[in-house]
């Protein structure tokens, strides 16, 4: 019985899953918009949102904890200098998951994951 076991396995070992979500979170924080499969996007919220909440309080201990979870110094820097202050007044809900149709090769449902209130470059103007 898997009572109270939250999270989706996504057909991967625990170490592969951990590395994959670490990489997805790093890409999301770097680019602020990524495209992935819908189940990965939904599960990514459970990894990325607590990191942004952690970044709202800039302490050495929080920076070390964020580095332990992301293993990327550039990501930690952006979290605490850009994203933490940006979401200081927002209580959660930092990510938006938008459905993006189906992948051509295997018809997997795709989704865009973006940070709410990100600066959008409009090239149409």
UniProtKB/Swiss-Prot annotation:
What UniProt keywords apply to this chain's record, in alphabetical order?
Ribonucleoprotein, Ribosomal protein
Q: What InterPro entries is this protein classified in?
A: Ribosomal_bL17, Ribosomal_bL17_CS, Ribosomal_bL17_sf
PROSITE patterns associated with the record: RIBOSOMAL_L17 (PS01167)
Which GO biological process annotations does it have?
translation
An annotated GO cellular component:
cytosolic large ribosomal subunit
Q: Where are the transmembrane segments?
A: none
GO terms for MF: structural constituent of ribosome
Instruction: Name the family.
Output: Belongs to the bacterial ribosomal protein bL17 family.
**Subunit-structure text:** Part of the 50S ribosomal subunit. Contacts protein L32.
Q: Which protein is depicted?
A: Large ribosomal subunit protein bL17
């Amino acid at each position: 019985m898997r009572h109270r076991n939250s999270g989706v396995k996504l057909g991967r070992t625990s170490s592969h899953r951990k590395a994959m979500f670490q990489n997805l979170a790093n890409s999301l924080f770097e680019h602020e918009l990524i495209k992935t499969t819908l189940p990965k996007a939904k599960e990514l919220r459970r990894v990325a949102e607590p990191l942004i909440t952690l970044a709202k309080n800039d302490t050495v201990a929080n920076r070390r904890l964020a580095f332990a979870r992301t293993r990327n110094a550039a990501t930690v820097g952006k979290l605490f200098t850009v994203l933490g202050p940006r979401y200081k007044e927002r209580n959660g809900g930092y990510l938006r998951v938008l459905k993006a149709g189906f992948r051509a090769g295997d018809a997997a449902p795709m989704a865009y994951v973006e940070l709410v209130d990100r600066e959008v470059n409009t090239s149409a103007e």
